[in-house]
């Protein structure tokens, strides 16, 4: 973060400075976890489901934080903001904020983040926005790998992509930062536009329009309206703006009419009209893709170290952004080929000592990413001549389409040749999945929780089998992967003792 005096922060965000030396400086980025606050940091007093950040201001200050952004005076150094009242929004940040105290802090945080971007932009900071229904985090991670080889780069950890994580990430930029990669999510129309207002992007990539958050939006067309807000926020082509669009998705390709930026296309299907496309795609025995990359400057062989055929499209988007930013194509190819998964529980592939392979893709799930995970599992199982086990939870936020989409998932399992399903949990979606799978004749086990699922899988799988673990975040299905790994370690320890 760029150093700022307490008085300047109060002026920028329009709050009242209390119990603080006006000349005291914030020299480190913001923190909303008091345990991470340290000398020179800015503490964010945000309300949550179980605790209120205002109750932890004193702890943050005692740990060295310079001051807090707060919505009420608790007798500690702070910039105090006026509560905004209950917000009419489906954003997660406002779910436990009846008085609008968190909304006031977040508005101030966004204002401060915009000030930082405006301060750094004349010095050469390039902001890149990435959005889409699926693949945002993987693409963001790939792009960060490429750009870090070119200069100091700030990118969010994991999926810090909403009204909290986005400005939080922006404040990590300083005068040395050359690239700021912003992952932008949405649960409604206007959300991406809001994030783009905080950190106006020079280059924006839209990956796809799928069915994630379908229950919030109502239709794919409304999702496209929201995702396209990113390209609307780009500067003109004359001012250096570039929109990177997926030629294989009609709703994304149509966004070209919504921007005055330069438009370039990528295509994992090898569409001839795409500026960046892949042909000759092959997968190895753990579903890592190799392909021929076609670019405006020639053809290049690419071998990815991440898993899943769907990663080809993500890689193409990252490649296109980097090349359009001026990075040499050969350097881009070298960096993308060396990239390994940086965010946990996203296509993490682990082979246990017994030979069992666990594909942990449990961070989130929607119909598109479910199919991609199943495809990767099947590819790996086929290459190993082993059985495939789908350990699945619900796909959340599908609204009225919940039952239909989970029925379709069961049908996709059958069509793909997956015979073993462990359906975890008691949600409506999981029940619909299990009931349809049983109707279709799949070997289906209904597990009430992650422990029951792990115990069943451990007792049933063969030593070289492949297990996919995937569900929406709320299901915490990564516990199945953790339990299976721990069980294997226990067996190994006992074997060593017996030996």
Where are these regions (language model features)?
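Short, basic phosphate-binding NTP loop
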Residues: 1-129, 139, 149, 447-460
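Non-catalytic positions within long, well-ordered alpha-helices that form the structural scaffold/packing
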Residues: 57, 61-62, 196-197, 414
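Residue-level signal for inorganic ion chemistry
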Residues: 9, 41, 60, 112, ...
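Short secondary-structure boundary segments
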Residues: 69-73, 208, 247, 425, ...
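Acidic, Mg2+-coordinating active-site environments of NTP-dependent enzymes
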Residues: 74-77, 123, 205-357, 386, ...
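Phosphate-binding loop of NTP-binding sites
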Residues: 94-247, 251-259, 459, 483-498
């Amino acid at each position: 973060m760029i150093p700022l005096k307490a008085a300047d922060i109060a002026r920028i965000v329009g709050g009242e400075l209390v119990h603080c030396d006006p000349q005291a400086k914030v020299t480190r980025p913001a923190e909303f976890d008091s345990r991470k606050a340290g000398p020179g940091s800015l503490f964010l007093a945000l309300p949550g489901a179980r605790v209120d950040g205002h109750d932890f201001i004193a702890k943050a200050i005692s740990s060295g934080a310079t001051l807090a952004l707060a919505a009420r005076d608790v007798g500690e150094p702070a910039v105090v903001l006026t509560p905004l009242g209950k917000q009419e929004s489906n954003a997660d940040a406002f779910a436990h904020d009846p008085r609008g105290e968190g909304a006031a802090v977040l508005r101030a945080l966004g204002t401060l983040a915009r000030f930082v971007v405006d301060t750094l932009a004349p010095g050469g900071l390039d902001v890149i926005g990435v959005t889409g229904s699926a693949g945002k985090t993987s693409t963001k991670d790939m792009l960060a790998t490429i750009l870090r080889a070119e200069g100091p780069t700030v990118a969010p950890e994991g999926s810090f992509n909403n009204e909290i994580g986005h400005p939080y990430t922006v404040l990590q930029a300083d005068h040395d930062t050359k690239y700021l990669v912003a992952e932008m999510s949405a649960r409604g129309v206007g959300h991406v536009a809001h994030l783009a207002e905080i950190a106006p992007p020079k280059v924006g990539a839209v990956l796809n329009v799928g069915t994630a958050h379908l229950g919030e939006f109502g239709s794919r067309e409304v999702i496209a309206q929201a995702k396209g807000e990113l390209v609307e926020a780009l500067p003109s082509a004359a001012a250096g703006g570039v929109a990177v669009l997926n030629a294989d998705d009609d709703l994304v390709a149509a966004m070209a009419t919504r921007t005055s930026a330069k438009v370039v296309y990528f295509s994992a299907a090898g569409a001839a009209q795409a500026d960046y496309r892949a042909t000759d795609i092959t997968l190895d025995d753990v579903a890592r893709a190799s392909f021929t990359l076609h670019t405006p400057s020639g053809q290049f062989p690419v071998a990815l170290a991440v898993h899943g055929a769907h990663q080809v499209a993500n890689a193409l988007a990252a490649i296109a952004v980097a090349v359009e930013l001026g990075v040499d194509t050969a350097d881009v190819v070298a960096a993308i080929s060396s990239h390994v998964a940086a965010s946990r529980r996203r296509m993490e592939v682990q082979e246990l000592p017994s030979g069992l392979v666990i594909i942990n893709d449990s961070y989130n799930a929607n119909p598109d990413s479910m199919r991609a995970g199943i495809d990767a599992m099947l590819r790996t199982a086929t290459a190993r001549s082993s059985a495939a086990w789908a350990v699945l939870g619900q796909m959340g936020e599908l609204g009225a389409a919940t039952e239909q989409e989970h029925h379709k998932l069961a049908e996709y399992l059958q069509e793909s040749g997956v015979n073993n399903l462990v359906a975890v949990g008691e949600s409506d979606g999981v029940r619909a999945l299990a009931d349809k799978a049983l109707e279709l004749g799949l070997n289906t086990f209904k597990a009430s929780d992650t422990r029951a699922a792990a115990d069943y899988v451990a007792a049933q799988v063969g030593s070289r089998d492949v297990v996919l673990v995937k569900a929406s975040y709320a299901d915490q299905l990564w516990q199945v992967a953790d339990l299976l790994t721990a069980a294997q370690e226990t067996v190994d320890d006992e074997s060593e003792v017996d030996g």
